[in-house]
Amino acid sequence: MGKRIDFYNDPDAPAPNSLVPSVNVVVTNADGDLLMIRRTDNDNWAVPGGAIDLGESIPAAAVRETLEETGITCHITGLVGTYSDPRHVVLYTSNGEARQEFSIVLVGRAVAGSPTPSDESREVLWVPRGEVAALRMDRSMRMRIEHYLAGRAEPYIG
């Protein structure tokens, strides 16, 4: 399996050769814990998410990706923001794709299922809000989660 390498404002980053609309979902349970995955491609922690398929709505992609990566079915309840910083490039070593960041981050509530790892998630855990900051994650993911935890009145647009 290839690796995922995130570059931020790095002069040595590869030039982007793709832009793929994607979703991430900050899913919470009844206790307010966040659903977190430890990714198989870079060993970092993240909220679930992935590419939006042709013919699929944003909420449908979010629900599908969450279920595929975690075993949890969620209901989408809100929007954290949009993240499209051209200085953030993600290199996938398996195929040479250098993707410019483009992600819509939603809020979801867990409605069914049990945390179950997949081929994209080494671990799936409910993490108390106060413990999320201690997890290793890339800068962009940390910012997305911090925006959610801050309870911003308006979605982030950037």
Describe the role of every protein-language-model region.
Residues 1-24, 96:
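Acidic, metal-coordinating catalytic segment for phosphate/diphosphate chemistry
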Residues 20, 40-42, 47, 74, ...:
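Short connector loops at helix/strand junctions that flank enzyme active sites
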Residues 27, 105-109, 126:
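Short, well-ordered beta-strand micro-motif
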Residues 29, 33-72:
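Conserved Nudix-box catalytic region and its N-terminal flanking loop in Nudix hydrolases
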Residues 43-44, 115-158:
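Nudix hydrolase/Nudix homology domain
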Residues 73-83:
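A short coil-to-beta-strand element that immediately follows conserved catalytic motifs
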Residues 85-114:
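Active-site-adjacent beta-strand/loop module that shapes the phosphate/pyrophosphate-binding cleft
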